[in-house]
Amino acid sequence: MIVKICGLKKAVDVAAAVDNGADMIGFVFAKSKRQVTVEKAHELAKNIPANVKKVGVFVNPTEEELKAAIKGVPLDIVQLHGQEPAKQANRTDAEVIKAFPVKDGKLPTNINDYPNAYILLDAPAEEYEGGSGKTFDWDKINRDMLTKNKLIIAGGLNAQNVQEAIKRFEPYAVDISSGVETNGEKDPEKIKCFIKTAKGVE
């Protein structure tokens, strides 16, 4: 199972994720309590091996902002969490994750407008996009409704429920941020436990 640890701001947290087998490291460039600058992400990325993908999280960025981060960090993947047009997701300089909030158990009608992107399902937004620590209603989503083989599940995951999420959705990857935090800070033990649990699902 591919595991993405998101919202990292400190070298010690990046090390905890990488050392315990994370496959993707997420840096948040959108307005958030986990926001980092391109310069900060560049410094943190120096300690990330080439086999671990670096992901930048954005909400309605300009094309200039995307290009600056892709080159400056550098990023392997951009994660779009706003109302970005499909053309912004069709790019050759980075892979793309397009995030969709699942509201009232319904999938967005435009989910198929992004054929080349990973599709990330998340809980509805609160003050900021993503990172709310809440799950969407899993019971109302039928895995058969999702034709993507690049499905990523996010929203309220933790070491206690990630196995159920994986068995239910059979996703390409799982994505976590607040679920590996204690008092708003990344917790190395929670990171270790989550990755071990997620990768233990057969």
From Swiss-Prot:
<dbReference type="InterPro" id="IPR011060">
    <property type="entry name" value="RibuloseP-bd_barrel"/>
</dbReference>
<keyword id="KW-0822">Tryptophan biosynthesis</keyword>
<dbReference type="Pfam" id="PF00697">
    <property type="entry name" value="PRAI"/>
</dbReference>
<dbReference type="InterPro" id="IPR044643">
    <property type="entry name" value="TrpF_fam"/>
</dbReference>
<comment type="similarity">
    <text>Belongs to the TrpF family.</text>
</comment>
<dbReference type="GO" id="GO:0000162">
    <property type="term" value="P:L-tryptophan biosynthetic process"/>
</dbReference>
<keyword id="KW-0413">Isomerase</keyword>
<comment type="pathway">
    <text>Amino-acid biosynthesis; L-tryptophan biosynthesis; L-tryptophan from chorismate: step 3/5.</text>
</comment>
<keyword id="KW-0028">Amino-acid biosynthesis</keyword>
<dbReference type="GO" id="GO:0004640">
    <property type="term" value="F:phosphoribosylanthranilate isomerase activity"/>
</dbReference>
<protein>
    <recommendedName>
        <fullName>N-(5'-phosphoribosyl)anthranilate isomerase</fullName>
        <ecNumber>5.3.1.24</ecNumber>
    </recommendedName>
</protein>
<keyword id="KW-0057">Aromatic amino acid biosynthesis</keyword>
<dbReference type="InterPro" id="IPR013785">
    <property type="entry name" value="Aldolase_TIM"/>
</dbReference>
<dbReference type="InterPro" id="IPR001240">
    <property type="entry name" value="PRAI_dom"/>
</dbReference>
